[in-house]
């Protein structure tokens, strides 16, 4: 485990950020930034509001030898109980905006909230992104994981991705970015930062779009734990098909292993949808990780199939 940041490092960082007029917050409870409502206190959360401030922040981190991690909407994330050995970068300002360009094109900042953003875009009369209105979190995180559901995924709509890598800003098309089912090359690049995307949609019938939005929302609410503290699907579907063409789902394997409803501390494998782990009390990251490892072991013992995590870990988790 990494060493805790020193008081001198933190004090010097704050002074540098203040002189550079880069917004930040001190002693931030990360649990309130997480849909799991799990996470400890981070010494500093830096909130750059434009690309220049992002670049300057990264320069400060590098010069001061400050370890850092980027946090978005916190919806597909398990945050450490002790995030005190790094500072957190969280985009703000212009990154929270989206705008219509022309011909069905929209530019969307990476810190926009996916559910209201894509619902609002759909209600403007543009179709194709309705499924994204059911996915919580921020657009940047949705890009990194190529978020999707109900037969659609974000990279189906993307025209370009703007991102920062090695202190340089790039704009790339999907054909220039490795991506697949719940995967992009950004997942393995911890120093890359998504700044925004442009998507292309078609004009549609507003009444049909409203129906589609409602159908997808109802479908989600009927099949997933509603109003529960969770991080969504814990594991990716294994992409294994039966002879009749039916896809084997991760939740079916977990259920087959007899783990539905299993509890550890304040965390529980959801009785409603066992590919969800929910915080039913004062769950810790360690509680959740225990259940994650239990699922991995039991599913493999029962079926011979190795599941892969969909949720990401943020910081050191025992």
From Swiss-Prot:
Its main location: cytoplasm. Pathway: Cell wall biogenesis; peptidoglycan biosynthesis. Residues 213-229 have a biased composition (Basic and acidic residues). Residues 212-232 are annotated as: Disordered. Residues 38-204 form the FAD-binding PCMH-type domain. It catalyses: UDP-N-acetyl-alpha-D-muramate + NADP(+) = UDP-N-acetyl-3-O-(1-carboxyvinyl)-alpha-D-glucosamine + NADPH + H(+). The active site is at residues 182, 233, 310. Pfam families: FAD_binding_4 (PF01565), MurB_C (PF02873). Cell wall formation. This is UDP-N-acetylenolpyruvoylglucosamine reductase. The gene is murB.
